[in-house]
Amino acid sequence: MQLNKDILLVSIISLFSGVLLGYFQAKCFKRSTITKNKEEVEQIKEIENNNQKEKEKEEKEGDDDDDDDDESESIDGDYDENDDYEIEYDEEIGDCKQVLVIRTDLGMTKGKIIAQCCHASLGARQKALKDSKKVLRQWENFGCAKITLKANSKEELVDLRNKAKELGVVSYLVLDSGHTQIPSGSATVLAVGPAPKEAVDAVTKHLKLY
């Protein structure tokens, strides 16, 4: 009889011990979960804050780059702020154009000719930017008219350039570096203008279309 009572007592103690142990384990697990969740939330917040800082930094750097671009344009001297590409036709200047005179005796490929024409056109534009800003603006605002003509020799290109200089017309003669198809120093394309049409025609009117 006494043995049964002892067994019952041990069973009751074991039961309560199990209940208490389970309770404390649950409490500890809950606390651990809360702590873990709190840490995860803090980590997420920290990541979001870092991402926000990176985004703000990138935006600031982007703004700085834009400022640098504006400054570069100003240094290049494209136009004054007051010019600001106003679309207003200047009757005194009239219609403007640029002629590209291509030398035909060199046997240049189409790709080579295109590249040389680009060099000539941009070179003449840079000269006009310095010496004929109003004419350049008129030309750029109203179509950037370009015509390709042909010459048969270096001497013809040089004569045309000299005539343009005499008349005060912007011109630019391209001398090739000789890295590809033709000898170094070869005169390839002459740009005449941008300038008023009459001034350009005074130099190139006798030439044939390319």
Swiss-Prot record:
One annotated Gene Ontology cellular component of this protein: cytosol
The keyword Hydrolase belongs to this UniProt entry's keyword annotation: yes
Compositional bias annotation for Basic and acidic residues: 40-60
Bias (Acidic residues): 61-81
Keyword Cytoplasm belongs to the record: no
Superkingdom of source: Eukaryota
Keywords: Hydrolase
Broadest EC class assigned to this enzyme: hydrolase
Region (Disordered): 40-81
EC number(s) per entry: 3.1.1.29
Gene Ontology molecular function, alphabetical: peptidyl-tRNA hydrolase activity
InterPro entries registered for this protein in UniProt: Pep_tRNA_hydro_II_dom_sf, PTH2
Catalysed conversion reaction: an N-acyl-L-alpha-aminoacyl-tRNA + H2O = an N-acyl-L-amino acid + a tRNA + H(+)
NCBIfam families listed in its UniProt record: arch_pth2, PRK04322.1
Family: Belongs to the PTH2 family.
Biological function: The natural substrate for this enzyme may be peptidyl-tRNAs which drop off the ribosome during protein synthesis.
Name this polypeptide is given: Probable peptidyl-tRNA hydrolase 2
Organism expressing this protein natively: Dictyostelium discoideum (Social amoeba)
Name of the encoding gene: pth2
